[in-house]
């Protein structure tokens, strides 16, 4: 579990408890500029202890994701996409180590699968049964897939400019 230790106001320095699904507003000055403060030493210990033997996807890093008990959820399998060494772009950039992350191998072929997976897992933990998203395409498709797996009803709002194939994928 990696919930913030506390929230710190960037305006007045006030520290307050983190409360999931509650708007982060400073209780001292009313600022909306609060930064989550984490125990990074604990993250390091958990990462080093827990990675070997875990599945190769986003949930490999469950100890540092903002979830209480991800092991208890039927999780959307995001992440774990290949990283390719680029023979084409490395020379012009003057660096022999240029890699390209290939998200085509994810559930909806978008890097937005990762955010959707974590957000929907948090919704499950919070007891959310229905959600809304406004999107121009990829986010709606990723959230639609993750919410469908989780049994969360999703309302999707898109403009008429969104390509038909994205509308079909999100439906």
Regions found by a protein language model. Name each.
Residues 1-171:
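PLP-dependent amino-acid enzyme catalytic core
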């Amino acid at each position: 579990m990696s919930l913030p230790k506390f929230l710190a106001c960037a305006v007045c320095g006030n520290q307050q408890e983190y409360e999931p699904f509650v708007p982060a507003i400073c209780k001292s000055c009313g600022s909306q500029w609060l930064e989550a403060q984490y125990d990074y030493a604990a993250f390091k210990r958990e990462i080093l202890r827990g990675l070997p033997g875990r599945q190769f996807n986003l949930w490999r890093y469950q100890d540092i994701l903002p979830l209480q008990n991800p092991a208890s959820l039927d999780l959307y399998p995001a992440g774990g996409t290949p990283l390719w060494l680029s023979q084409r772009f490395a020379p012009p950039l003057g660096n022999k180590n240029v890699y390209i992350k290939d998200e085509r191998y994810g559930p909806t072929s978008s890097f937005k699968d990762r955010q959707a997976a974590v957000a929907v897992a948090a919704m499950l933990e919070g007891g959310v049964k229905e959600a809304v998203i406004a999107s121009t395409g990829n986010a709606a498709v990723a959230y639609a897939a993750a919410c469908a797996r989780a049994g969360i009803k999703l309302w999707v709002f898109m403009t008429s400019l969104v390509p038909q194939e994205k509308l079909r994928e999100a439906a």
